[in-house]
């Protein structure tokens, strides 16, 4: 953008206006690809049958509900310790803090036993936490360990920035997995800080070989792992810092055994779990772009199979399509209770205060749209 300077007779550039236009264009590239919500294809609608998620007979899979952060860390350490062939870890956020180093140490110990370890982390954490970090470099440099980053941050491709990997699970061999909302940080694992998220996870164990939902999860992981959006994270050079970090992580494991002696004992997995009829996992498309809302469609179909249903979520933001779906579900005869986090209980209160009007607006919109079957509760902690 140029203007004419009357004093000098020269043209000058109005950088402020130029920068403003550039910022607006960048924001447009960041948001416009996601403004128009995709519709669920007829192919997926025909493929998904909610009745296939149920069974009248007891299944092979057994489940446990993990709510305590220290117990969640112990489960990870024990599962990894017992692994003989393979460990798979997927997480949105992975920090090289105390809890994160505990998990790294366990993964390295497993790799030294010739267990194949694969770790995938979201690109935001890959950029903020892993880039150049000597502990993650040490992890990636270890034989039998592979690390990938899903959709790494690329400021030259803002249209990909909203596509994030929020999957959080641990799989060991073909017998068990842990899945839920816990990231691999002090906020979610162990008792290492003043502030903690009281989170929820499901542990699934199958005594008789690989279970149906475990096959689902492993197949899902393989698709994400092989995706072109998932990039390899490598240690380019084993510097002194990296070697010292590796030594620290290796020497950490005996201390973990002393700190968490239960992982040395034999665990009766059957006694720790309860019988289930059937476990089914649902997911959205995995590509780093605007996606068909397979999850929301599936959830609505499942809601309509019962008279009373509960949705537990840290927060909820509905578009017009979601309001219409909720109204339709309630008109089908289902009463829906939605439990969200209380904004005052959130560790990251600033973010959730921005979302609180959305939650209140959902209640008002449901009332305005006469969706009488929807009620709301606030959970007095932080759960995901």
Residue positions per predicted region:
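Charged, low-complexity intrinsically disordered terminal segments
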Residues: 2-145, 156-166, 172-384
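Lumenal/extracellular "mature" regions of secretory-pathway glycan-modifying transferases
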Residues: 148-150
């Amino acid at each position: 953008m140029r203007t004419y300077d009357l004093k000098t007779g020269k043209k000058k550039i109005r950088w402020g206006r130029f920068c403003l236009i550039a910022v607006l264009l960048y924001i447009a590239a960041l948001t416009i690809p996601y403004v128009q919500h995709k519709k669920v294809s007829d192919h997926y609608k025909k493929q998904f049958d909610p009745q296939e998620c149920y069974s009248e007979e007891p299944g092979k899979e057994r489940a446990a509900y993990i709510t305590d952060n220290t117990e969640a860390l112990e489960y990870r350490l024990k599962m990894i310790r017992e692994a003989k062939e393979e460990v798979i870890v997927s997480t949105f956020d992975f920090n090289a803090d105390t809890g994160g180093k505990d998990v790294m140490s366990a993964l390295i110990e497993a790799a030294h036993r010739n267990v194949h370890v694969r770790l995938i982390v979201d690109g935001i954490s890959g950029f903020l936490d892993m880039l150049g970090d000597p502990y993650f470099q040490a992890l990636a440099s270890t034989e039998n360990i592979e690390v990938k980053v899903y959709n790494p941050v690329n400021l030259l491709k803002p249209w990909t920035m909203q596509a994030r990997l929020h999957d959080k699970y641990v799989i060991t061999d073909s017998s068990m997995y842990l899945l839920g909302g816990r990231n691999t940080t002090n906020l979610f694992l162990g008792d290492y800080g003043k502030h903690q998220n009281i989170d929820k996870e499901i542990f699934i164990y199958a005594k008789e070989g690989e279970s149906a939902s475990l096959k689902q999860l492993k197949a899902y992981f393989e698709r994400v792992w092989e995706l072109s959006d998932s990039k390899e994270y490598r240690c380019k050079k084993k510097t002194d810092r990296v070697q010292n970090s590796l030594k620290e992580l290796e020497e950490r494991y005996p201390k973990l055994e002393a700190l968490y002696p239960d992982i040395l004992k034999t665990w009766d997995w059957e006694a720790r779990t309860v019988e289930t009829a059937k476990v089914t996992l649902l997911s959205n498309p995995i590509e780093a772009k605007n996606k068909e809302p397979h999850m929301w469609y599936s959830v609505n179909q499942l809601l309509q199979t019962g008279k009373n249903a509960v949705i537990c979520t840290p927060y909820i933001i509905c578009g017009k399509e979601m309001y219409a779906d909720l109204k339709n579900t309630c008109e089908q005869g289902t009463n829906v209770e939605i439990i969200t986090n209380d904004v005052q209980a959130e560790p990251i209160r600033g973010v959730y205060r921005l979302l609180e009007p959305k939650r209140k607006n959902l209640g008002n919109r449901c009332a305005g749209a006469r969706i009488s079957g929807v009620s709301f509760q606030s959970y007095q902690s932080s759960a995901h």
